[in-house]
C-alpha cells in the first residue's frame, strides 16, 4: 500500500462510521459531488446515483470511476444539490505549487489550510438550497485566517448541524480535532444543531 501523503496531499481517509453518519445527515436528493474522494469511502456509497461525481487528484489511490483532476482546476458545467466529503488538511506551506497557483489568495493569508479553500469553492458550486456535509478541523469557526470564509458562509446560508468531536480520534492514527457539519445555502434560520442541543451560531 502506498503511504498516506499526509503533508502534501492531506490524505487522511474516512472511516465507515463517519461516512454513514454524514450520509445520514443528507437532506437533498439530486446531484452530488465528492470533491476529494481519496480511496472512495463516500464514492462507494453514492457512485450508482444518476448525477454523482467524484474527483481525486492522486491517480495512484483514486477509486474506480473517479475523475482524476485537481479540484481547483476542473471546470464544472453544473452546480450540485449536495457536496459531501473529507477535504484534505494541508498547511499553507505544504500545499503543492501546482495547486497553490490555482487558488484565489485575495482574501486569505499564509495561515490558511487547504481545506478552507475547498469549503470556499464548494459554496460557489451549490445549487439554491444546496448542502455541504463535511468533516474538517473545527478551528475554521473562529480562526482569524478564516474570517472571509465565515462571512461567506453567513451571507449565503446557515450551518444547520455542527458536531464537535474534540480530541476523539475520528481517523485511524490521526486526531486533528474535527467536527462533522452541514451547511445549507439560502437557509437563514441561524439555528445550529449541536451535541448539546440547538443554538444560534453567529460566524
Task: Identify what each model region corresponds to.
Residues 2-23, 30, 36-64, 71-203:
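Signature of N6-adenine DNA methyltransferases within the class I
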Amino acid at each position: 500500500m502506498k503511504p498516506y501523503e499526509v503533508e502534501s496531499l492531506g490524505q487522511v481517509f474516512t472511516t465507515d462510521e463517519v461516512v454513514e453518519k454524514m450520509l445520514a445527515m443528507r437532506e437533498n436528493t439530486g446531484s452530488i459531488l465528492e470533491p476529494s474522494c481519496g480511496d472512495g469511502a463516500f464514492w462507494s456509497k453514492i457512485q450508482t446515483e444518476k448525477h454523482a461525481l467524484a474527483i481525486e487528484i492522486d491517480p495512484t489511490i483514486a477509486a474506480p470511476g473517479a475523475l482524476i483532476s485537481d479540484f481547483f482546476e476542473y471546470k464544472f458545467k453544473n452546480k450540485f444539490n449536495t457536496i459531501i466529503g473529507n477535504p484534505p488538511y494541508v498547511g499553507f506551506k505544504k500545499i503543492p505549487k501546482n495547486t497553490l497557483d490555482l487558488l484565489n489568495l485575495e482574501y486569505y493569508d499564509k495561515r490558511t489550510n487547504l481545506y478552507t479553500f475547498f469549503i470556499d469553492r464548494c459554496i460557489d458550486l451549490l445549487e439554491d438550497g444546496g448542502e455541504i456535509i463535511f468533516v474538517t478541523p473545527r478551528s475554521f469557526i473562529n480562526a482569524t485566517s478564516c474570517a472571509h470564509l465565515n462571512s461567506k458562509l453567513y451571507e449565503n446560508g446557515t450551518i444547520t448541524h455542527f458536531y464537535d468531536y474534540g480530541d476523539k480520534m475520528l481517523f485511524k492514527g490521526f486526531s486533528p480535532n474535527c467536527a462533522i457539519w452541514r451547511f445549507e445555502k439560502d437557509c437563514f434560520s441561524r439555528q445550529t444543531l449541536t451535541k448539546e442541543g440547538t443554538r444560534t451560531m453567529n460566524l
